Amino acid sequence: MKTYEYVLLVIILILSLCYFIYNNFLNKPKAPERRVVATDSIVELMEAEKLTAAVFFGSQTGTAEDFAYRFSTEAKANFNLTNMVFDLENYDLTDLDNFDRSKLLVFFLATYGEGEPTDNAEAFLQLLEGDDTVFSSGKGIEDTPFEGIRYAIFGLGNHTYEYYNAMAKKVDAAMTRLGATRVGNLGLGDDAAGMLEEDYLQWKDDTLPEIGKLFHLQEVHKEYNPMFEVIEKPEISNTSSTVFLGEPSRQQLKGNVASKAPRSQANPFFSSPVRSLELFKSGSRNCLHLELDIADSGMRYQTGDYASICPMNPSQAVDDLLEVLGLKEKRDTVIIVKPIDTLDKAPVLSPTTYDTVFRYYYEICGIVSRQLLSFIAPFAPTPESKQELEKLGNDYDYFKKNVVDLHLNLAQVLRRVSPDAPFTKLPFSMLLENMAHMKPRYYSISSSSVVHPDKVHVTAVVDKKEWTDKNHIFYGLTTNYLLAHCRHMHGEKIPHPNGLEYTLEGPRKNWTGKIPMFVKKSTFRLAPPDVPIIMVGPGTGVAPFRGFVMERANLASKGVKVAKTLLFYGCQYSDKDFLYKEEWQQYKDVLKDSFELITAFSREQDHKIYVQHRLLEHSDTIAKLVEEGAAFYICGDADHMAKDVVNALASILTTVDVDGMKAVKALRDDNRFFEDTW
């Protein structure tokens, strides 16, 4: 072949290659891409995205957000209701008066502290309740600017607080006052009664059909339609620097977190415990004291604030769930999770792994929801397991007896209904859509910020509950995680007495010996030193009061005159579970007669004696201090102790002319009555 023929052949090959590339890649029509309009106006965004409903959440720990997404998913699946979930603080809602009257607003609102809005809902409440609020059309509150707007609302609260579900009630009242009309009942979820899930299901089952009627939407019961695509990427190593292995944010993964960025669950401080003690070990009960270094965190706390601990799930729980799903061999397989509708938010940071999702990002140790079991039933491996899951999902009494009362998690229920066959057909996306995300746990800081500005002290009883007749043990998530750190810190060969194991080294061994945490502000504040205080805190409820007394002792040591500081403390035995027993005497030595500790040991006599009984025994002292302007504090169990203490206080304050409960309310209104209960 001659030279020019070679050249001609090469040219033909090049042209053919170019044509192939152009025809198959460059000239390939692109799939239509749906983009969310960049605006902070809900009115504009809903119009641009052709949405029928906007679902808002006001959430402190993420629970209200989880419910909002669950509602959004079910509304789309069962009623074809086009909607999107929004964080209240991310949007300018002054133009809500221009909201399309043919559309719907839905609110999921948690109440925080003493009837306060969550941080991300504070501005929204101020907008609705402000006397000088002017909306975009120029209308004020008195002009009923929301006339014709329809809304639905579900609140998350705790009935043991006086201001039960105050946020939902306030927003509901404000929306009505502004002219809006509520669809369905005002949903009031009660976390204290353990009925939050059931309260939500009842409200949702009543409200969704009402919404369907409003928009002429027929309820459809179609097969499961995933919101997210879960794509396995076996070609990507789980050691790749791009894979999330438990990092709480993209900035954390990349290592470029701004030094002054606010601390939160997405940007926790990794604190080194500098001291740890087990204050008592009594049978199956033990109590921890941990001191966490925050010197380089950029955080500052005030006495009475919370230490927010970001836990992880124990390895045993992760293994159990992976095994029952048939994913144990794939635990380290890299997966990418993508929303099918680009309006939706990805539920986890990805790429990640199956192991990581269950270890760090989701709550897998808590009681499984009844609704999730009913969703899983069609994917059960056997007819028998399907039938059992359907019964658990549809019969609340049966579910309560066999799941709630035993504190069973998802893996434990699935293993019981199908001991031999794994749930290999269960879509992973269904779990991502319906399980709760991992949330921080709040612990009252047990130190004084004046005495220990660079250290946060945490006091916690390790949670363990055993049903010997059922061969089942429930372990508290965060307290057992902290116990593992405590044992690790002391270098014990058996790191955990309950046999639980944790990857304390964290992702890529970057957390070794450190606990992810941040400080959460509280309204539980120590009164000025010249104000008498009465504190009631049995068990670990004494934690914030240790900080209070510590601070007053510090002030007294500097010559500051301190008013009466009266502490009522209770536990089971004086020689077994008396927290900080020697320490109280040290404070007494400094504070002298201004400090008094009154104890109640419930099991040292034939009849039980609790702190409320001691209050009644010291009625005259308490009444006198209240008359002198004392502040009254309660910390601890909400279901029984707090109620009994309030009743005792009301009894003490009752006179011929004064109703005791009204007197307690007057203390609240005067900012002299504080509760921190759970």
Curated annotation (Swiss-Prot):
EC number: 1.6.2.4
Endoplasmic reticulum recorded as keyword: yes
Cytoplasmic topological domain residue ranges: 27-678
Binding positions (FAD): 441-444, 459-461, 476-479, 678
GO cellular-component term (any): mitochondrial outer membrane
Keyword field: Cell membrane, Endoplasmic reticulum, FAD, Flavoprotein, FMN, Lipid biosynthesis, Lipid metabolism, Membrane, Mitochondrion, Mitochondrion outer membrane, NADP, Oxidoreductase, Steroid biosynthesis, Steroid metabolism, Sterol biosynthesis, Sterol metabolism, Transmembrane, Transmembrane helix
Record's keyword annotation contains Magnesium: no
Membrane topology of this protein: Single-pass membrane protein
PROSITE patterns for this protein: FAD_FR, FLAVODOXIN_LIKE
Transmembrane segments: 6-26
Subcellular location: Endoplasmic reticulum membrane; Mitochondrion outer membrane; Cell membrane
A Gene Ontology biological process term: ergosterol biosynthetic process
HAMAP family reported in the protein's UniProt record: NCPR (MF_03212)
Name of the protein: NADPH--cytochrome P450 reductase
Organism: Schizosaccharomyces pombe (strain 972 / ATCC 24843) (Fission yeast)
Gene name in the database record: ccr1
